[in-house]
Amino acid sequence: EITTRLVGSEMCIRDRSDSPNWSMVYNRQALGKSLDYVMLMAYDQVGRTSPVAGPTATLPWVETSIKNTLQSVPAEKVILGMPLYMRVWYEAANGKDLPKDLADWPAAVTETAVEAGTGTKQAAAAKAAAKKPKLFVRTLTLADSQAVRNKYKSSVVWDNALGLYKLDVQLPEGRLKIWFEDDKSLKEKVKLIPQYHLGGASFWRKGFEPANFWQGFAKHELT
């Protein structure tokens, strides 16, 4: 009845809950029967309030989220939501966050740093471990992430088990950790859409993407 009355329009419904169990409190089966589409927000695997650094959306976690949702919602109604962001996690030994401007971030500590008077990588790590570091976290958009990768490119590695690139590098006053989302990681997630016969894709959020992003991913969006 609502669909008939709202021809040419859209209505987004967000169920309310004060439960600490997050989305599992929702009656997904009832929602799946009543709604045209159910948006599965497959991101924030590790949220910004976490006391421990972690990824935004690893491939195994996303696939598990899909499987759990399909137990109560028809596949053709499920829209896979994917992140156009990640988080910068910085464990600061000196209790101070990294500068706002990437250009002011320090270089990674290497064995050759002795010549510059900054000590060895092991010494820096020992200094960071001497007292419990303070964890700082900030959001990094897909559009801005390439500059960070370029700065620390020798330390960025692909994690096949997680389905994404990650950075774990020692800096002079702390440790920097980022689990990157990019074209490769998102394409791996997109493969799950036809695999599980889902209704389409969505991304959070518009404005976080780099130029020309939609040329490769727009065909997967719900239209």
Model-derived features with residue positions:
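Single conserved hydrophobic/aromatic residue that forms the stacking wall/gate
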Residues: 1-13
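Solvent-exposed loop/turn segments at secondary-structure junctions
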Residues: 14-18, 37, 42-48, 84-89, ...
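Alpha-helical scaffolding within the catalytic cores
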Residues: 17-29, 63-68
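Aromatic- and acid-rich polysaccharide-binding/catalytic face
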Residues: 25-56
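Conserved, mostly hydrophobic/aromatic
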Residues: 38, 80, 193, 201
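Glycan-binding loop/region signatures in secreted carbohydrate-active enzymes
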Residues: 84-192, 221-223
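C-terminal functional modules
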Residues: 190, 196-197, 204-207
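Aromatic-rich peripheral "rim/lid" segments of glycoside hydrolase catalytic domains that contact
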Residues: 192, 207-223
